[in-house]
């Protein structure tokens, strides 16, 4: 069973709130999950300490068992001071290189 560390959306319309969960990779985004390991509230100021709350010990455990974080969650994990496995870091770098950057509307009008 492939396991992911990802965000599950909650909250009301136009007021998002996310749980950082450990879930089966094939499960729906907001569906069943194995464990809740944190929260993310994008409505709070970026310097607020409660914007991202993570259980570091449980995340380290799941990373050790082979769970793969999504790109956004991997950024949260790195900011929290948890080291990601080399394999996960390498995959993130490859994805970043392959990502196509579209020019903004201003850049396309100027050309």
From Swiss-Prot:
It comes from the Bacteria. Keywords: Ribonucleoprotein, Ribosomal protein. InterPro entries: Ribosomal_bS16 (IPR000307), Ribosomal_bS16_CS (IPR020592), Ribosomal_bS16_dom_sf (IPR023803). One of its GO terms (molecular function) is structural constituent of ribosome. PROSITE patterns: RIBOSOMAL_S16. GO terms for biological process: translation. Coiled coil: none annotated. SUPFAM superfamilies: Ribosomal protein S16. GO terms for cellular component: cytoplasm; small ribosomal subunit. The keyword Ribosomal protein applies. PANTHER family: 30S RIBOSOMAL PROTEIN S16, SMALL RIBOSOMAL SUBUNIT PROTEIN BS16M. Belongs to the bacterial ribosomal protein bS16 family. This is Small ribosomal subunit protein bS16.
